[in-house]
Amino acid sequence: MAQLQSEIKNGTDKSSSATAVKYYAGIDLGGTGIKCGIVDENGKIVAIKKCPTRKGVEAKEIISDMANLVKDLQKETGLTLEGVGVGCPGLIDTEKGNVVFCCNLAWRNVPLVKTLKEQLNLPVFVANDANVAALGEYHFGAGKKYKSLVMITLGTGVGSGIVFNGKLFEGNLGAGVELGHEVIKIGGEKCTCGRKGCFEAYASATALIRQAKKAMDGDKESLLWKLVDGDKENLNGKIVFDALREGDKTAEKVVKKYTDYLAAGVTNVINAFHPQAILLGGGICAAGDVFLTPLKRKVNRQIYGGTKFAPVEIVVASLGNDAGIYGAAALAF
């Protein structure tokens, strides 16, 4: 069994006055780790437990690790659960509860819901992890005041999820939407999916760093070299924006080009779905106004019909790495 780490947040109230509150487990299943949290119906995480995602084992073994996380949290908190939700990467059949395909775990046609339900004797639900994160923000985070939203996460890739009127838009196959793989530049940079010119290849944090490294080669006097101690491998998104704040021209050019591409992709999403809000997640968003202000300006210039016809707010997601736990728990509400 995988090694477990647990954390109880602010204790739990086991008195009779708390018996009316309902509790749910949310599991965030990733390629390297599994996180499980108990969330109450008011959106408070009362406990979290996690373990590594084991390599080279069958799917049923990983599902057993998930079940053990839930069981251990129940023992530690003394709480009764109403249900369990799971956010899993890949193509999910939400009706049957099967993981049709997950490249990160090398899973095909895994009956996740059936197997987990047998071990926990609780209602179990599963959905795509990016969708689940969007649902978490909708219920408990920056999306609470909106009826419709699209969440775009800028990380290693570009993740996305859509919520309309409290319901996930999952598409015909249950895989959610892959907005990161809309093409914004024909014949452009090769994407991990095999196509060229994908949004992800230009707007992910990975893309920002790649663009900055390339620009550094053309300017040996750039402040970026000093900030990375002469080693480009130390570069990250924060350093790029730090250099921008210090007036570095190379960083300025990189961020301008990056926000141009990001704005193009975000505008495409707005023109296609007309949500009330675009939620942006990922570490890049910590750059604040130096990143968001030019992005919003560029998007507003491009929206079909203008902002008066289709006003959309662009805001930063607020739940961070816990969005998956919140959203997974919300599947069981």
Region annotations inferred by a language model:
Residues 32, 132, 156-159, 186:
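Conserved A3 ("GATE") glycine/threonine-rich loop of ANL adenylate-forming enzymes
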Residues 175-178:
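Structural signature of FAD isoalloxazine-binding scaffolds in flavoprotein oxidoreductases
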